[in-house]
């Protein structure tokens, strides 16, 4: 026996306080928890009584809840700004479903999360989070007076997306950042496309679709004359507002394709293929819709288009979903198309302590957004 640390059960006394050892900490030149060489080593690694206080492997619930709350507040603030265009623009009414699906994807990813890794220095991430508040505050301020300005929507969405990646990295290191990226990426499907790009895409695809529809009508024995994106038949002229639903079918098909890709667990390459196939299918179905509307107008007159317009658009959505689901079932049978997801390791290393500070920073910054916006406009009105 002796008076060293081994005789006191691996504890050191320092003015009445106890210093606890952690696995991996070096004491007397040897890491705690590693098997030492030699028979007479006083701290056998296999004997738990010599390790009175090891690092807990159970996840830190407080850190986890801070992680959840910070992410929730960020995305709720974004969805609150996007809700205006979801409600006023029928092209983006599918946006109401995106938060629900994104939450499901995040919950699914959480149940299969890998073991977290300790990130390196956390202060650069905290500085980056603080820096992201500047563009987010600017976009939030402008959207208060111009709620339909889509570049500001994307600026705000980009800041929220980047902040979410930083939070995931702080909580579980690079493994969590990679694992949860798709859940954050999917939520961006709710953001409207830039207006100029949307108008250009709609116009170009409508021109091509009108030409194809005119060719099909002429091949079927129905005289059709195409002028730009208008189709003239014997009963009247069908304009783009009658024959093309804009980008609704494209964004909704893209959303469904991304959702099925996660549901079936496809690899990245097959998810991209599924998304492209969904967009192509939506466009071909849109041409079929033009053809159906022309035939309906020829049988019942131009006025009947009001009765066929919305049902035809709804049919496109259902057919697109059915096609993507059938294609997903077929792709699932291909060898190597899917990735087996394993349940989350229990217990796993605790999340990094820096996530608590970062989450508090995010919560405070997000709470300041409406306050600074209101203060700004009150100050401007007082001038």
Map each language-model feature to its residues:
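Low-complexity, Gly/Pro
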Residues: 9, 31, 38, 48, ...
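Short linear sequence elements within intrinsically disordered, low-complexity coil regions
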Residues: 26, 33, 52, 381-382
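N-terminal functional modules and adjacent low-complexity/disordered segments of proteins
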Residues: 16-18, 46, 288, 374
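Hydrophobic N-terminal alpha-helices or hydrophobic patches in metabolic proteins across all domains
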Residues: 54-383
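Tryptophan (W) side chains
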Residues: 41-43
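Residue-identity detector for glycine
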Residues: 2-4, 9-10, 16, 24, ...
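Compositionally biased regions
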Residues: 4, 37, 48, 57-58, ...
